[in-house]
């Protein structure tokens, strides 16, 4: 009977020893598991960093593209603004051209009156105030015209210029160089450097 008990006790001890051996942690397995976990974490970190870098690169490219588009838009706007300013300036520059052309014959009449004023004054000295009034009108008209860019073309004594003068005839004149304006019948004018009326002249042969 004691022999059976002894065997039973040994059997239980062996079983417990096996169970303990099975349950005891393996240091090698634990080390491998820790390495795998660390590798997985590092891999995730690397992947995350790569994604962040890619996102940052894309953002930089987008910013560069937007900046270039903005600069092009600003440049286009500035060009359009300058073009419109030039157009407005051009319109303003020649807006009065048609009106001035219509008033030039009136100015011619005033000048003819003043040229013949001496005859009027000889016959009627009291007409001096009338002549002075006409002179004042002429001066005021010229101030208005000149403020808008009107200038009288030089004629008598200058070389004939087909762009500025209209030759009514030619004649010989002693001491005058050929193709020189020797007489002016009607003055010519430029408006902001554009000829609005040629001078009507006689040219020397």
From Swiss-Prot:
GO MF term (any one): protein homodimerization activity
HAMAP family in the cross-refs: GrpE
Main subcellular location of this protein, as a coarse class: cytoplasm
Superkingdom, natural source: Bacteria
Oligomer status and interactors: Homodimer.
Keyword annotations of the record: Chaperone, Cytoplasm, Stress response
Cellular component GO terms, alphabetical: cytoplasm
Cross-referenced SUPFAM superfamilies: Coiled-coil domain of nucleotide exchange factor GrpE, Head domain of nucleotide exchange factor GrpE
GO terms for biological process, alphabetical: protein folding
Stored InterPro entries: GrpE, GrpE_coiled_coil, GrpE_head
Protein name: Protein GrpE
Function: Participates actively in the response to hyperosmotic and heat shock by preventing the aggregation of stress-denatured proteins, in association with DnaK and GrpE. It is the nucleotide exchange factor for DnaK and may function as a thermosensor. Unfolded proteins bind initially to DnaJ; upon interaction with the DnaJ-bound protein, DnaK hydrolyzes its bound ATP, resulting in the formation of a stable complex. GrpE releases ADP from DnaK; ATP binding to DnaK triggers the release of the substrate protein, thus completing the reaction cycle.
The gene coding this protein: grpE
Family: Belongs to the GrpE family.
Alphabetized Pfam families for the sequence: GrpE
Subcellular location(s) per record: Cytoplasm
Biased composition (Polar residues): 19-35
Chain segments carrying region Disordered: 1-60
Stretches with biased composition (Basic and acidic residues): 1-18, 36-47
């Amino acid at each position: 009977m004691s022999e059976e008990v002894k065997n039973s006790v040994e059997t239980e001890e062996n079983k417990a020893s096996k169970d303990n051996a099975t349950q005891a942690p393996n240091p090698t397995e634990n080390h491998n598991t820790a390495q795998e976990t660390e590798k997985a974490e590092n891999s995730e970190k690397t992947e995350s960093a790569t994604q962040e870098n890619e996102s940052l690169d894309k953002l930089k490219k987008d910013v560069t593209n937007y900046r270039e588009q903005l600069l092009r838009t600003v440049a286009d706007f500035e060009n359009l603004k300058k073009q419109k300013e030039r157009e407005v300036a051009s319109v303003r520059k020649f807006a009065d051209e048609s009106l001035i052309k219509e008033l030039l014959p009136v100015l011619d009449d005033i000048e003819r009156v003043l040229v013949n004023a001496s005859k009027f004054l000889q016959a009627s000295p009291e007409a001096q105030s009338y002549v002075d009034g006409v002179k004042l009108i002429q001066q005021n008209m010229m101030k208005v015209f000149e403020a808008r860019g009107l200038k009288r073309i030089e004629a008598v004594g200058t070389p004939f210029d087909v762009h500025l003068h209209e030759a009514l005839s030619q004649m010989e004149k002693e001491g005058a160089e050929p193709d020189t304006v020797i007489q002016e019948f009607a003055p010519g004018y430029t408006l902001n450097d554009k000829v609005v009326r040629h001078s009507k002249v006689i040219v020397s042969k």
